[in-house]
Amino acid sequence: MGSPRPRWGRRLARLGGRVRRSLGSVDWILSAVPGWAPAYLALWCLILLSDALSEPTLPAVRGVSLVVLAILSVHAIGQRWRGGFSKHDGAYLVLMLLGAVGSFLDTAATPLFAAAWIAGTVGLDRRTRDAPALTRCVAMIGVVGAVLSRSPWLWNAVNRLAVSLTTALFSWAGGGGLGASASGLSALLLVSPCLVWAAVRGQRHRFVPVVTAIALFLVHAGSSSLFGFSPRHRLAVELVYVALLLLLCVGVVRGQRRFAGVRRPRWWAVVPALVFLFVFACGMSWLPELAPGRRYAEPRIVLFVDHSLLGSWSTPADAAPGAAFSGANFGQFPEYAGAAGHRVVTGYEIDEERIDDVDLVVIINPGAPFSEEEKETLYAFVKSGGGLLVLGDHTNMGGIMDAVNGLTAPLGLSLAFDSAVSLDPGWSRALCVLPPFSERFRPIDVPVSIGASVDAAVHPAVAPFLVGRRAFSDPGVAENIERALLGNLAFDRGERYGDVVLAAVRYLGRGKVALFGDTSVFQSSALILSYEFTDGLIRWLTDGTGAWRAPFAGVLALLLLFGSALLLDRPDALVSGVVAIVFTAGVLCGTTIAVSPKDVGPMTGPTALIDAGHGNLIRWDPLHTSGVEGLGVNLARNGFLPFVHHKGLVGSLPSPQSVVVSVAPTRSYSQREIRDLLEWVEDGGGLIVTTGWPQSTALAPFLADIGISVSPVPLGAVRPDVVSLDVQPQLPSAWPLETSPEWAPLGSVEWDDARYTVIAERSIGLGRIVVVGDNGVFLNENLEGKDYAYVENTALLSTLLSRPRGVEDPS
């Protein structure tokens, strides 16, 4: 008799048995569905992860797609487990693992990661006789999706083609004007390689799939355009359209079984092609990205030209409470540029002498046309390496459109006589950020509002970089003078819908010209969110990298499409997965190089960091009642330059003469953040925290370290007595504070024969910490918004900001 199996061996055997039974159960479930169902599900998941639909992919939909792919992977592993692994299966397992890990990272290469994941899964499943054709289709969907999302010039050409086609076909019936995603052209292009291969390789009825797909596109575009569906119905129609396209692809794949038994690839011939694929993908992603030049970190000289500005250069300090959000105020744009290290110059004239030593010229809402001499001066300035930033607004209010188009139309950029309107209350779901800003900024960092759309010509040197996906173009009404020539701001049939360009750039010589159809991003009330974007825009427009980069990136994108198609011609599943992984590596390498951190230095002067990196209960829709624009305006009135910070506080704290305001954080500070915060306060910093008892549990470790806690006694709306304040502020939902002797009460309220502290202060070193027992006192609805202000609460904030620091007894 042999020696008994050790305990760990028995446990391992039991674990293996459980795994086999689990895999067997999944395999039994999937064996009940038709043989084409796994391939159909995989294609569906890939389309959803490619974000090719007009409706942005919701996180829940993305999560379901990843779960479905995981189930298909378990099914494939179960098939191999029961039949026995071979020496070739290790490569498929590696593909599956790499693709699965990358798909959960939510990067620019997510569709390619998913394609590699599916290729590995299909390669492991021995019952998939259509593996070569299926994985070839999957890989090309990932490649086409990545190329369209990484090449703004190519995306613009496809989008203009969709608008022209739908307008030409359906304008006679009052329809047309659909963008690439809304018309279904993006989805058709994703699956087009599969259909083209079917036409090339087929024998009988080879063109039937292509003709059928085109017919589906026309039916979908026509119904979406002519019937003017609501967003909910539009999405349903689009899902049916994509479902039929994918059924067509599955049918084509199953019709190519005779090519399943191709010979193994000659890797000595494939490897050089893969190297070129990696280099081209890296170049396509790197060339148009942010600031690849050596000058990125250097400060710029920025000239703000007042060319009969329709607006004002006022700042919040110039406006009375409640009036800061009325009108177009740009006074803080130069202030933020100066705080970022740039030298700001202002002027009224455009001539060679004035702009000779300038890096960037900024023109906002020009109310007068440009002379030919001014145009030629600006064109020559840009060609020599300068940057030109032109900001306009909706319709032709005040003649802005005529003045702007007279300057930028010869360059292929112009403002439309319309208003670009989001279907959502804000632009958080509607806005799509394209390269060169897609990897560094989110829609929340670019708070656009209602402005004009930008007509970007199809030109190798013209590229959009801000697009409204769920948005429409509402034509202006020249007779509606009382409402600034606006239309009805509602979507009507026949209006341009989907993929509306909001900002674009023209590469010219060694410089760039950027045109925005909306000035909201650069107004004083929005710069607390957009300050990093505007600084990146200033540096990118003036990096002097040359106009050849954009056309060359477009050429690389086209070469990648043709090269990938040739490389995937009749391969096996392994080659398809390797192509997807190599393409992924190139895209990630290019974007990593381009967006690697650049040392531009912190913002200078007294600043106010509004913490948004700890689950703070703040809404980011423009002027939302739970927003913080009013807080930013009041911080500016008190001499601080405010900015919202969405990341952690480690290494991000401003200078000690500044202040940090944390509104209702629901996620705890790390030990490193607590240590850095306390050291920063000791050096002279000021920290203001507003929190109620429900939110204070997240801050318990930090509050315990500094000797304070929030009591679970709801006081409701109260008006406390505040030290050094003649008026009583309004706390909408107050909670009492329990403090150690080091704390001094600043605000207290008498309730039920007891006095409760609701505002307390503690000095630590040269700085101080203030805690307010109310999570919403400094939100817009309780502080300041458009045409209203609670002067008692603005006075409270001013008092807290102006109190001396480093004093032991503030009372």
Please give the residue ranges for each predicted region.
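Short, surface-exposed patches at the edges or C-terminal ends of soluble domains, predominantly
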Residues: 261-811
